[in-house]
Swiss-Prot record:
It is a peripheral membrane protein. It comes from the Eukaryota. (2R,3E)-phycocyanobilin binds at C184. Contains one covalently linked bilin chromophore. This protein autochromophorylates (Potential). Belongs to the phycobilisome linker protein family. It comes from Cyanidium caldarium (Red alga). Its main location: plastid. The lineage of its organism: Eukaryota, Rhodophyta, Bangiophyceae, Cyanidiales, Cyanidiaceae. Pfam families: PBS_linker_poly, Phycobilisome. Residues 241-421, 482-665, 679-856 form the PBS-linker domain. It is found in: Plastid, Chloroplast thylakoid membrane. The keyword Ion transport does not apply. The gene is apcE. This is Phycobiliprotein ApcE.
């Protein structure tokens, strides 16, 4: 699992700002309590001032041009700065009543109703180093950006006034001074902001309370702009297998931070009780004293009297019977490790190596040892120490690793204890699998293969948040409609050759134009258009009937029509729209990230119409369809092909059942089940134990001086371990040295088998690509000549493999009593149960009869008892 691995799910939208109401409610929600009197008073104050805040925002918005003009005239000379202001298209339009009432209020606030009396007055002091900027020298592009920035600053102030919190100003202006210094002058920006503040205050000359509100937020804007940019919060890692962590400081400002409880000697009894409740909420994920009336009174008294620290109190809660019953007994060891990290470390597992370490501790020493190892960790001491209660280190607290993104957020949910299936180890295992043949940005982006428009799978039906790692150069498999030899990847020159099993609508002088029109409508829209929709398309249809445009131009114009855009572009997510339009116009799904990223670039830079033109004018379209052919389906996804086959088989089976005559039961019972033919009689005569047991050959060394016999045994050992003849691969390297040692008689057959199993080639072929359970099956097959006996043996070797590695597990098998009693030092291992009767024949037969590399399924032992333990 690489350091750049990304989980990719679920979607998390960072919080961009706070509000006065959300701050109060969030604090009470995190403490699991109702609002107190002071918080209710704060909410009442905020909501009672709501109308005033909205009026202030309206007045400032209506006089935005005046405020920006005064600020721009203060720092720019030699032109009209306001002419460069470009209002956004989504600006809010006030009604006539609102505009009239607001204009009256704003005019009265400017001092005796004379707006121009204060227009040329400047009350802001220029900082040191300020020089006015010449409009002509500054340039049109820079002027538009500067005036746009002033407009943004003013809008941020109105947003903050309505929200009742300054976080939106801090997030959007902190650290901009260094950025603006590179473009023009930060001193000029400060002068403009102060001028905007003075003009805004002059709008409320007769309302001191409104002036105080405006002054508060403008002062915050100026101070945050002047403050230096804060560096990102970086989390250094102590291992090379962990991803680096860094999060911008503005995310920490806007996010809801976790409450941190610290036990101090000078706390009151009420505050100490809150710390104890926080410990319960963190470890048990709920306040057990409030919800169930449970508490650990002895431990609570020791903590209140400072006889033990918070760290030891958390340790005692983890080792309690209540924690063992709720988070250990009903879960697998893998899930226990995941939940323990959530409770005691405030995060999820970071890597597979970390999981293996703590899984081995839990498996060998139990739950208490796992909790001790987590709490005694240096990371716990760095974050929480002796006095701080552990807290959830989620989004906004610190940067989150991308390779466990989805599982980490699922672990932080309240429903995490109700999920018994381990998530992190399953996630880490998915990273080693080959990517499936699906859309590179999620299988929900592939439309259903039906003729009812753009219909996609629902993300809430059988939802799975397991990621799929698609490299940049990956290309998914598509099924060609015709002969596979003519696919465009294997035969690029065969693009002009249409599939043999697809009906094609091609225009010619003899072809009916209505047929081409209907085929084009059906292809582009996925259905026949309605009469109301056809009215808008009538001019385009008449132009095609006059043969003024070709079929290709007609298809492109249909895709650019308002009807098509409203159906398959405006209402869909852009990735789904691109995929569906690509299928309709080019006749195949997209291949992978490289192709669809190119379409993303075209859409965001040039728009929808340029995207349609890029498809219709592409080399692939012209080669396949030309100017006179309506596009047709050339490729399908494997899922679409399988679903169509299933539908056809289902329809055929239903029709066959309906036509099949019903036979009475007494007639069925009177007919013999099978005819006694001569061949069936002969097969029953020769049934029994086959000749495979007597025909097997055992390779044994009786004389180590016979070099020819030793060479035969050497190659037999290689075939036994690698299941094939690898003679071409032993010309040099480690097998050449092993061969020379064996032919000289310095090592025995058993030592030869051990050296072959410890080779790097065996590790590459039978260990790295497979999970541990399948590795154990391969090793028992190669070194013991059989399948695993039972689940107990698999668990035993699984523990050896996880803790000590592949080499030690092979040594355990070769040095076992079973190996020595069956093969000894001089016999090459062989298949021990080729026929019945044999105790382990079913599993051994299944293991030997299947293809090793093509089958990733695990042979599950058929024994239910655990009598033969290792």
């Amino acid at each position: 699992m690489g350091l750049r691995t990304s989980s990719g799910s679920p979607l998390v939208k960072p919080k961009l700002y706070k509000t006065s109401a959300s701050n109060v409610i969030s604090l009470a929600e995190k403490q699991d309590r109702f609002l107190n009197l002071g918080e209710l008073t704060d909410l009442n104050t905020y909501f009672s001032s709501g109308n005033r805040r909205l009026d202030i925002a309206k007045v400032i918005s209506l006089n935005a041009n005046l405020i920006i003009s005064r600020a721009a005239d203060r720092i720019f000379v030699g032109g009209s700065p306001l002419s460069f202001l470009e209002r956004p298209q989504a600006a809010v339009t006030l009604t006539s009543d609102q505009a009239s009432s607001t204009s009256i209020q704003s005019t009265k606030g400017l001092g005796n109703g004379n707006i121009f009396q204060n227009f040329f007055k400047s009350t802001s002091e220029a900082p040191t180093g300020f020089k006015p900027i010449n409009v002509v020298r500054y340039g049109s592009s820079n002027m538009k950006k500067s005036i746009r920035d002033l407009d943004w600053f003013l809008r941020y102030v109105t947003y903050a006034i309505v929200a009742g919190d300054t976080s939106i100003l801090i997030v959007n202006t902190k650290g901009l001074r260094e950025l603006i210094d590179k473009a023009c002058s930060s001193s000029a920006a400060i002068v403009a902001l102060k001028e905007m503040k003075n003009v805004s205050l002059s709008l409320f000359n007769y309302d001191i309370e409104s002036q105080n509100i405006v002054r508060l937020y403008f002062n915050t804007l100026v101070s945050e702009f002047e403050s230096p940019a804060s560096s990102s919060k970086v989390r250094k890692r102590n291992s090379l297998d962990l991803q680096g962590l860094a999060i911008p400081d503005i995310y920490l400002v806007a996010a809801d931070k976790s409450l941190r409880y610290v036990m101090k000697p000078n706390l009151s009894n009420t505050e100490k009780a809150q710390v104890i409740k926080a410990c319960y909420r963190q470890v048990f994920e709920r306040d057990i004293a409030k919800a169930y009336g449970l508490s650990l009174l002895e431990l609570e008294s020791k903590l209140k009297n400072l006889q033990i620290s918070v760290k030891e109190f958390i340790r005692a809660l983890g080792k309690s019977t209540l924690y063992r019953k709720n988070f250990y007994e009903g879960f697998t060891n893998s899930r226990v490790v995941e939940l323990a990290f959530r409770h005691f470390m405030g995060r999820g597992l970071s890597s597979l190596q970390e999981f293996r370490k703590y899984f081995a501790i839990l498996s060998s020493n139990g739950l208490d040892a796992l909790i001790d190892s987590i709490i005694n960790n240096s990371e716990y001491a760095e974050y929480f120490g002796e006095e701080t209660v552990p807290y959830i280190r989620g989004y906004g607290q610190e940067a989150q690793e991308c390779r466990n993104w989805g599982s980490q957020f699922a672990l932080f949910k309240y429903s995490a204890p109700f999920r018994t299936i381990p998530q992190f180890i399953t996630l880490f295992a998915d990273y080693t699998q080959l990517p499936p043949s699906q859309h590179c940005y999620g299988k929900l982006n592939d439309p259903l293969n039906i003729q009812f428009g753009a219909i996609f799978k629902n993300s809430y039906v059988n939802e799975q948040s397991r990621p799929v790692l698609f490299p940049r150069g990956s290309r998914r498999i598509l099924v060609y409609k015709g002969a596979g030899i003519f696919n465009q990847l294997g035969s690029p020159n065969a693009l002009e050759k249409p599939p043999s099993n697809v009906s094609i609508a091609k225009w010619s002088k003899e072809t009916d134009l209505n047929f081409i029109l209907n085929a084009a409508y059906l292809r582009v829209f996925g259905r026949y258009v309605y009469e109301e929709e056809k009215i808008a398309l009538r001019p385009l249809e008449n132009e095609f009937k006059r043969r003024s445009i070709s079929v290709r131009d007609f298809v492109g114009q249909l895709a650019k029509s308002d009807v098509f855009r409203s159906l398959y572009w405006s209402r869909l997510y852009i990735c789904k729209s691109i995929e569906y339009i690509h299928i309709r116009l080019l006749g195949r799904p997209t291949y992978g990230r490289t192709e669809i990223n190119n379409y993303f670039d075209i859409v965001y830079k040039s728009g929808f119409y340029a995207f349609v033109d890029s498809l219709v004018n592409s080399r692939e379209y012209i080669k396949c369809f030309g100017n006179d052919t309506v596009p047709y389906d050339r490729y399908s996804t494997p899922e679409a092909v399988s679903s169509s086959i299933f539908r056809l088989s289902f329809i055929n089976s239903v029709s066959y059942k309906s036509l099949k005559p019903k036979i009475e039961k007494f007639i069925q019972l009177g007919v013999a089940r099978d005819a006694k033919s001569l061949s069936s009689l002969n097969s029953k005569v020769f049934q029994g134990v086959s000749q495979a047991r007597s025909q097997k050959r055992v390779f044994k060394v009786s004389d180590y001086s016979n070099v020819m016999n030793l060479r035969i045994v050497f190659y037999a050992a290689l075939r036994q371990v690698f299941e094939r003849n690898i003679e071409p691969y032993i010309k040099g390297g480690e097998f050449k040295d092993i061969e020379s040692l064996f032919l000289s008689g310095k090592i025995s057959v058993r030592e030869l088998i051990k050296e072959i199993g410890s080779s790097s080639l065996y590790r590459k072929e039978f260990y790295i690509p497979f999970p541990n359970t399948q590795v154990i099956e391969f090793c028992t097959k190669h070194f013991l000549g059989r399948a695993p006996k039972n689940q107990s043996e698999i668990r035993y070797y699984n523990q050896v493999l996880a803790v000590q590695g592949l080499r030690e597990m092979i040594n355990y098998m070769i040095n076992s009593k079973e190996y020595l009693s069956v093969f000894g030092d001089d016999i090459v291992p062989y298949r021990r149960f080729p026929t019945l009767p044999a105790a382990n024949f079913p599993n051994t037969q299944r293991l030997y009869s299947r293809q090793t590399k093509q089958n990733r399924n695990i042979v599950v032992p058929s024994f239910s008892g655990l009598l033969n333990t290792v």
